[in-house]
Amino acid sequence: MLQAFQHRRWSLVLLWILIVAAIIAAPAVLPVFRLNLLGRFLSLAIVALGIDLIWGFTGLLSLGQGIFFALGGYAMAMYLQLNSSADLPNGIPEFFSLYGVDRLPGFWEPFHSPVFTLIAIWLIPAVLAAVLGNLVFRNRIKGVYFSILTQAALLVFFNFFNGQQKLINGTNGLKTDVTQLFGQMVGSPEMQRGFFWLTAVVVILALSLIHISEPTRRY
C-alpha cells in the first residue's frame, strides 16, 4: 500500500512537471491566436477549481459558480468600455444612445480607474459569495437542495442582467474588443504573452491556496 502511495505521488509530481513545462513552452511555440485560446481555457480552469474545492472537499455541487466569474468579467468589461469610449463625443459607451441615455450612470464612474477595477474584480464576487454562503450555511442547506438553490440563483442573476438594457446593454453584453489597454496595444504579441502569463500565474496561485488552506490540508 505504501509503495502504491509513493508511486501515485511521483506520478503526480511528474504530471505537474509536464504541465509547468508545457505552460513555459507555450508562448514560444504557439501563434498568438492559439496562445490567446489557451489563456481562455486557463481562465475557465479557475472556475473549475472553485467547483472542485466546494464539491470535492464538502460534497456540495454548486451549479451557480458562473455568477462570480461573470461579475468579475462585467467589472473588467465596464473598464474596457469606458477606455474605448474616451474619444467619443459624449464620452460614454455607444450602446447608451440606443436607449436614450445621455449621461453615464453613477455606478459606472469608478470604473474609469484601472486600480478600482482590479479591486472590484476580486471584491464584488467575494462579497456576494460571503453573503450567499452565510445564508446557505446558516440554514444548513445541503445535498440536492443546495444544487437547486445555486442554480436558481444563477437564473435570477442571468435574467436580471439580461433585463438591464439601459445600464449594461442587456442580452447584447458589453463590447470588449479594445485596441489599447493600459497604454499598450492589446493585439501585440508582447501583450498577448503578458495576458497568458498573468492567467497562468493566477491559476497556479489559486491551486496553491486551495492546497495550503486549513480545510483542505486534512485531505
Residues covered by each model-derived region:
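Transmembrane alpha-helices and adjacent helix-loop boundaries
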Residues: 1-218
